[in-house]
């Protein structure tokens, strides 16, 4: 991993860490010498469901009774997110993809909300902003609560001169203004981990991903936008739109530098980050530093996974994979159990119950108005 380690003075947090719930006391009593994995135990499931968990970063494109039953059993609520990806045949057609997502939302018995998007590949078309806003507003009328800006802006799409189009391109500004005017949230996945711009490193958490998805591996490409350029463009969106709620997906793509995340959260009150698919980066930091960081920014960290499921796949296998991911994250955040990551053992953070409730539930409700059905 590259970047700096985030360090805090810990004196102010020890009292809060000492306030353990039953799931933490159980783990402390049992000890944590052996790494734990797999799906939830009955005790773990009881503790997990009690926080009313919300996964604010999921991609669901099936309407399967067994899958829906699993979501209910885990007492989960989801934000179902669409993107336009010209590299994936399943994600090229925004209208068709959205229909599949809405079908799941409508069948979820109020357990899913919808995050729409727009087609950035049309950015050079005449009337791009107006047609995108028209689509987005139609989705708002259907009940969408957020809009996704994806990493192909900054890492793939180019202008007529062959330059990478960045997130603060003027063509997008009317869209951001419209989202803010409707009191919706922008989910911004811009840039990727540092390893996308670095020489191959098998020790990186993302090594396998870039081997399988070379289109996003910027190292060695001619004249790519740097990660810093892309994130600075994101920051200009925050500055130009102070009333726009922005959730930076994947720790805001600042996963290697928790000091930088902290600076952004201090500087931009309209900015929060989700934890989706970046839990390994938390595990790689010193435990005490992560506890201090999370306690300080407990109102700005939102739980998400980036779990996905598509039609035509093995639903049962995916269900097991989903539950194992929720169980692994819960053990790391909520208990002092020992987990194994890349051949080494990692101790859970055993966060206080009130902090877990914020990360898993309260922050999602505040940063994504409408994520829960009005009847709750």
Where are these regions (language model features)?
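An N-terminally biased module of ancient metal coordination in phosphate/nucleic-acid-related enzymes
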Residues: 22-111, 131
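Hydrophobic faces of well-ordered beta-strands that scaffold small-molecule active sites
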Residues: 54-58, 78-81, 112-116, 147-149, ...
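C-terminal motif of bacterial Sec signal peptides marking the signal peptidase cleavage site
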Residues: 15-18
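Conserved beta-strand->loop/alpha-helix structural units within folded catalytic cores of enzymes
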Residues: 58-60, 144-149, 169-190, 239-240, ...
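Acidic-and-aromatic substrate-binding clefts and catalytic sites of carbohydrate-active enzymes
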Residues: 57-65, 85-97, 121-130, 157, ...
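Bacterial N-terminal signal peptides that target proteins for export
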Residues: 1-7
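H/E-rich (His + Asp/Glu) clusters that bind or coordinate divalent metals
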Residues: 36-37, 222, 227-236, 241-376
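Active-site gating/metal-coordination segments in enzymes
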Residues: 44-46, 95-218, 269-272, 279, ...
């Amino acid at each position: 991993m590259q970047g700096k380690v985030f360090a805090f003075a810990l004196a102010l947090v020890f009292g809060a860490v000492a306030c353990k719930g039953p799931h933490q006391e159980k783990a402390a009593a049992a000890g944590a010498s052996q790494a734990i994995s797999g799906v939830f135990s009955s005790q773990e499931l009881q503790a997990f469901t009690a926080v009313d968990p919300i996964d604010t970063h999921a991609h669901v494109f099936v309407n399967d009774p067994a899958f829906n039953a699993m979501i209910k059993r885990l007492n989960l609520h989801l934000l179902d997110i669409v993107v336009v990806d010209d590299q994936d045949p399943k994600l090229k057609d925004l209208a068709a993809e959205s229909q599949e997502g809405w079908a799941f939302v409508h069948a979820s018995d109020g357990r899913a909300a919808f995050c729409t998007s727009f087609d950035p590949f049309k950015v050079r078309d005449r009337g791009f902003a107006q047609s995108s806003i028209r689509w987005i507003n139609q989705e708002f009328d259907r009940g969408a609560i957020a809009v996704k800006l994806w990493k192909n802006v900054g890492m793939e799409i180019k202008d007529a001169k062959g330059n990478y189009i960045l997130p603060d391109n003027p063509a997008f500004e009317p869209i951001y203004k419209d989202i803010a005017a409707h009191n919706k949230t922008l989910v911004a996945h811009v840039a990727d981990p540092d390893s996308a711009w670095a020489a191959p490193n098998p020790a990186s958490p993302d090594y396998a991903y870039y081997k399988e998805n070379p289109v996003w591996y910027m190292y060695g490409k001619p004249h790519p936008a740097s990660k810093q350029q892309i994130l600075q463009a994101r920051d200009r969106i925050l500055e130009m739109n102070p009333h726009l709620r922005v959730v930076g997906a994947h720790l805001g793509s600042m996963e290697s530098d928790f000091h930088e995340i902290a600076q952004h959260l201090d500087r931009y009150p309209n900015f929060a980050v989700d934890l989706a698919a970046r839990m390994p980066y938390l595990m790689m930091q010193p435990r005490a530093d992560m506890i201090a960081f999370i306690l300080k920014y407990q109102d700005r960290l939102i739980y998400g996974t980036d779990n996905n499921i598509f039609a035509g796949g093995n639903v049962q296998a995916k269900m097991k994979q989903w539950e194992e991911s929720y169980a692994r994250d819960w053990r790391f955040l909520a208990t002092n159990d020992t987990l194994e990551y890349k051949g080494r053992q990692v101790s859970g953070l055993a966060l206080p119950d009130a902090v877990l409730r914020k990360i898993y539930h309260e922050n999602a409700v505040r940063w994504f108005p409408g994520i829960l059905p009005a009847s709750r």
